[in-house]
UniProtKB/Swiss-Prot annotation:
GO terms for cellular component: cytoplasm; mitochondrion; nucleus. The keyword Phosphoprotein does not apply. Adapter protein of the Toll-like and IL-1 receptor signaling pathway that is involved in the activation of NF-kappa-B. Required for efficient assembly of mitochondrial NADH:ubiquinone oxidoreductase. Residues 1-58 form a transit peptide. Pfam families: ECSIT_C (PF14784), ECSIT_N (PF06239). This is Evolutionarily conserved signaling intermediate in Toll pathway, mitochondrial. It comes from the Eukaryota. Its main location: cytoplasm. The gene is ecsit. Residues 413-452 are annotated as: Disordered.
């Protein structure tokens, strides 16, 4: 018997109770309902058998975990917004945000409801929380998120559904998962394709996105001739050597370690930390420094950032000002290099502008900014003037003329010298005293900025 007939019979029972105007007691019999009213005859009406709820679907289980309770509370008390699962990851993980906790939250959501209600909002919230758990570069976690989608529900069944955007919100969510994989450089595997085919079908937008990724990723995988390793050295000295070698354009450049990181304890019990100092200099830079005019200063500038994947290091330069045009000396051309007897196949000198082609527009001109020569580079654990002075002292061993050249330190605030939040709440009296100290100490600081 259909459900509509059952509902009509239940409504008839309520009408009988309203017509008699007396309370009715229902006694559930195997196939009939015995309606008893005080002072009336027995009326037998066939009623629907009571529905029994399975023990598996009961929500009063005693062995529920904390995450299951959080997911259930979030489902019952969720807002009408699009994303309502952001707090589940924070409250479930607590302080330990690891891959295990992330997978645990996903598993609890999958086992909560077989229909996966709210799975799109959950996937968007999980994508946003992946960098906090450190799983943004793990392909297995992305496959686990794709497994949250119901299978064979969003697959188009005819050509009309394929022609239009079938279930656009779910397809857009699947494309967003692949977009994040592409942004973090994660290569999909065969399991990703199987999941996408089971969820959206073979002619869907996520499958087309998957095909584009698999076409372009192998082509650009080895295009960089100087790749950065995925695991960087943990030792600061090794990391500095790798970074300076990557910056230097000369293969003959030599790396020198002027000081290793160490910690000493004085007789008074004071702890002194010595940072590492690693420098690099090529033979051409050394010869240019030897020709530098001792009357003109050289400058120590920095720090300049260098990004190695997600890690940022800083380096410093020893450079000079650009040479004025009136002091430039043109190189004399050897007449033997341009004589008619030179070989046409191996010419010693060719006066051709290789930067300009025959069809180029000569009216467009780009002003090239001239910069001074760079004599050396270094990386140090601390960017203060005392530490960099030790680097200059080490350079004087190979370039004695550096002791006769004045050195000016033009240093900016490094990463360890940023203003903290406690300095923002400084009292006006303290600020006035600080300004007075700076004004009094301004002239000695200029004198200390130049090292003779």
């Amino acid at each position: 018997m259909s459900a509509s007939h059952h509902l009509l019979r239940l409504q008839c029972v309520r009408c009988v109770s309203h017509f008699l105007g007396t309370p009715v007691r229902q006694v559930i019999l195997p196939g009939r309902a015995h309606l008893q009213t005080p002072g009336s005859q027995h009326i037998y009406v066939q009623l629907l058998r009571p529905f029994h709820r399975s023990a598996v679907c009961s929500t009063d289980r005693q062995n529920r975990t904390d995450i299951e309770k959080l997911v259930e509370d979030e489902t019952h008390h969720k807002d009408k917004t699009l994303v309502t699962h952001d707090d589940i990851f924070d409250r479930a993980a607590g302080d330990s945000k690891t891959k295990v906790e992330f997978n645990r939250v996903v598993d609890v959501f999958k086992s909560k409801d077989i229909r996966r209600r709210g799975h799109v909002e959950f996937i968007y919230a999980a994508l946003k929380k992946m960098p906090e758990f450190g799983v943004e570069c793990d392909v297995t976690v992305y496959n686990k998120l794709l497994d949250v989608f119901p299978k064979e529900v969003f697959v188009p069944q005819n050509f009309i559904q394929r022609m239009f955007n079938h279930y656009p919100r779910q397809q857009e969510c699947g494309v967003q998962v692949l977009e994040q994989m592409e942004n973090y450089g994660v290569m999909p595997n065969i399991e990703t394709k199987v999941l996408l085919v089971q969820i959206f079908g073979e002619k869907s937008h996520p499958i087309r996105k998957f095909q584009r990724i698999m076409y372009w990723f192998p082509k650009f995988k080895h295009t960089n001739p100087y790749p950065v390793p995925h695991v960087l050295p943990s030792d600061p000295v090794d990391l500095a050597q790798f970074s300076l070698t990557r910056i230097a354009a000369d293969l003959d450049a030599k790396i020198t370690i002027y000081q290793y990181p160490s910690t000493d304890i004085t007789e008074t019990g004071e702890e002194i930390t010595r940072p590492h100092i690693v420098g690099i200099q090529s033979p051409d830079q050394r010869s240019l420094l030897a020709k530098h005019n001792p009357c003109k200063p050289v400058f120590v500038e920095g720090p300049y950032p260098l990004w190695l994947r997600q890690k940022c290091v800083h380096y410093y330069l020893l450079r000079a000002d650009p040479i004025p045009p009136e002091e430039k000396v043109e190189e004399e051309i050897d007449p033997e290099m341009i004589c008619p007897e030179q070989s046409l196949f191996f010419p010693q000198r060719v006066e051709l502008d290789l930067k300009v082609d025959m069809g180029d527009d000569h009216s467009f001109n780009v002003d090239e900014v001239e910069e001074g020569a760079v004599y050396a580079m270094c990386m140090a654990g601390q960017g203060d003037q005392a530490t960099l002075s030790q680097w200059i002292s080490g350079l004087q061993e190979t370039c004695p003329i550096l002791g006769q050249i004045p050195t000016v330190f033009r240093l900016e605030s490094g990463p360890r010298e940023l203003q903290t939040s406690t300095d923002d709440h400084q009292r006006p009296e303290q600020e006035a005293e600080t300004d007075q100290i700076i004004e009094d100490d301004e002239e000695p600081r200029h004198s200390r900025g130049v090292k003779q």
